[in-house]
């Protein structure tokens, strides 16, 4: 029996639901709010339908993988109580000692054939970033560092959670929230200048709700 060709129906740009989606009372984060505001279809697929992308990283996902590994480098470095007393050379020496073990346990795809350029790029950028960040922390008078700080609060009536990459306490007890990104352009600097860095704004609100003073 010959079947006539039937083209697939066109995909609509907008899908209207018959009734509002119940989001429940689960705490929201910057990631979920950013999806809700800027990509609501993705938000519904992930947060309502429960669909999740694979957690497996491939060698092609350079920025995502390198960013995760760089976060781990600074988390491990600042886990040392004397991190702020290290010279740049000492800190870079520590990284060179630890890098191989980190790649073996958490970044094995960078050890695969063909990933040598990405691996060397990762090492070079981390060494430069370690020295640069330590210079900034010293000049600011940093006295205490906390990594991966979990905070909770509210945004209006919505429960809000966040995890700050690096929370710095200065000599005058003021705090600074740092969010580390792996990209070399001016995208995030532009957001800061324009007052549009939503992630840091949310973190600032959470810190103020927790400590009583904005960073």
Regions found by a protein language model. Give the residues of each.
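C-terminal, charged and often intrinsically disordered regions of DNA end-processing helicases
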Residues: 1-78
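Active-site-adjacent bridging/hinge elements
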Residues: 14, 39-51, 100-101, 168, ...
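Glycine- and acidic
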Residues: 18, 22-31, 50-60, 76, ...
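Secondary-structure capping and boundary motifs in well-ordered enzyme cores
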Residues: 25, 33-41, 58-69, 91, ...
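Short, well-ordered alpha-helical packing segments
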Residues: 34, 45-49, 71-78, 127-130, ...
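A non-catalytic, helix-rich entry segment at domain boundaries
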Residues: 72-150, 154
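Short glycine-/polar-rich loops that comprise or flank the Walker A/P-loop
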Residues: 214-215
């Amino acid at each position: 029996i010959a079947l006539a060709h039937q083209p697939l129906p066109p995909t609509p740009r907008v899908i209207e639901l018959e009734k509002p989606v119940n989001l429940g009372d689960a705490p929201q984060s910057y990631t979920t709010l950013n999806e809700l505001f800027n990509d609501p279809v993705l938000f519904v697929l992930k947060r309502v339908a429960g669909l999740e992308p694979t957690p497996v990283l491939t060698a092609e996902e350079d920025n995502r993988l390198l960013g995760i590994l760089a976060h781990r480098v600074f988390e491990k470095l600042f886990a040392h109580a004397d991190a702020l007393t290290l010279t740049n050379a000492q800190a870079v020496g520590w990284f060179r000692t630890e890098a191989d073990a980190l790649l073996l346990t958490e970044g094995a795809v960078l050890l695969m054939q063909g990933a040598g350029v990405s691996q060397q790029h990762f090492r070079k950028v981390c060494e430069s970033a370690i020295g640069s960040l330590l210079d900034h922390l010293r000049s600011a008078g940093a006295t205490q560092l906390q990594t991966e700080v979990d905070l909770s609060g509210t945004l209006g009536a919505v429960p809000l959670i966040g995890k700050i990459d690096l929370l710095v306490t200065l000599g005058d007890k003021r705090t600074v929230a740092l969010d580390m990104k792996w990209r070399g352009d001016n995208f995030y600097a532009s957001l800061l200048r324009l007052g549009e860095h939503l992630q840091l704004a949310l973190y600032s609100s959470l810190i103020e709700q927790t400590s009583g003073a904005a960073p």
